[in-house]
Design a protein with these regions (language model features):
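Extracytoplasmic cell-surface/polysaccharide-interacting catalytic and binding patches
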Residues: 1-39, 116, 126-144
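Disulfide-bonded cysteines in secreted/extracellular proteins and peptides
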Residues: 14-18, 42, 52, 81
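Aromatic-rich, lipid-facing transmembrane alpha helices and their immediate juxtamembrane interface loops
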Residues: 16, 63-64
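Short linear motifs at secondary-structure transitions and domain/linker junctions
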Residues: 20-24, 49-55, 89-95
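Amphipathic alpha-helical interface surfaces
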Residues: 25-32, 42, 55, 72, ...
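Short amphipathic alpha-helical surface micro-motifs
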Residues: 27-29, 55-59, 96-101
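Extended, low-complexity, intrinsically disordered C-terminal regulatory tails
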Residues: 34-61
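Catalytic cores and adjacent binding grooves of peptidoglycan-active enzymes
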Residues: 64-65, 69-74, 78-144
Length: 144
């Protein structure tokens, strides 16, 4: 079973109640989340990590091969201590000796990117979390 300083098993397990995720969730994903949390300096709320295939199928717009089903993705609420633009910068610049998040997608509620605690970000380690500083991440957003 994976372990993390700032993420409990109840936070990474599937939200449908099946309890799945302990044997699937990426340790690399949790390690990068812990580093992000330390850099931000305030608590981060996790919306979703692992989704079992049945739960994933019930999510509108979710693809069958979702990174959540593979245990390599996490949705994190923008903390109230940062604007969404500031939080996005932290995600983009979080690296350790192995690398950083491979992909992220930004979902902002008011569209401005300047509200505190506004929106959430999807992060994943689909390529092993080895993206190096200066390398492009896979990125999408809905700002605008």
């Amino acid at each position: 079973m994976p372990s993390a300083r700032y993420v409990s098993p109840g936070e990474w397990r599937c939200r449908c109640g099946c309890g799945g995720g302990d044997d699937v969730v990426s340790q690399r994903l949790l390690d990068l989340f812990d580093l992000l949390r330390e850099r931000v300096g305030c608590a981060l709320q996790i919306n979703c990590v692992y989704r079992c295939p049945a739960h994933n199928a019930s999510i509108p717009g979710a693809v069958p091969n979702s990174q959540h089903v593979l245990g390599t993705a996490m949705d994190i609420q923008c903390p109230k201590c940062l604007t969404s633009g500031q939080f996005k910068w932290y995600v983009e610049t979080t690296f350790d000796e192995t690398g950083g998040f491979d992909a992220y997608g930004w979902y902002v509620y008011d569209g401005s990117g300047e509200s505190y605690g506004d929106g959430f970000i999807h992060v994943d380690v689909r390529n092993g979390g080895v993206r190096q500083e200066g390398e492009e991440a896979i990125y999408w957003d809905d700002i605008g």
